[in-house]
Amino acid sequence: MSKNNLNETESKIEIEAKVVELLSNDKFKVELPNKKTIIAYVSGKIRINNIRILPGDKVRIELSPYYPTQARITYRFK
């Protein structure tokens, strides 16, 4: 079994975004700085610590270069 030399965290793209709308199952519609909207889901640490995310909040998201229409919310700014 060979492992890929590229680390998963190095291939992720981190961007600040704004939450526009709440969707079901802890998913959110977020707006990127280029005014494009994508679907984002909550990371496990945010879910475990019961951090509430509301429309209008600024968040940090991780985008995968392989699936750029879906993101993961990793941090909510105060």
Curated annotation (Swiss-Prot):
Top-rank taxon, per record? Bacteria
Residue ranges of the S1-like domain?
Answer: 2-78
Tell me the compartments it is located in.
Answer: Cytoplasm
**GO MF entry, a single one:** translation initiation factor activity
Q: Matching Gene3D superfamilies, A to Z? A: Nucleic acid-binding proteins
What NCBIfam families does this protein's entry cite?
Answer: infA (TIGR00008)
Partners and quaternary state?
Answer: Component of the 30S ribosomal translation pre-initiation complex which assembles on the 30S ribosome in the order IF-2 and IF-3, IF-1 and N-formylmethionyl-tRNA(fMet); mRNA recruitment can occur at any time during PIC assembly.
**Name recorded for this polypeptide:** Translation initiation factor IF-1
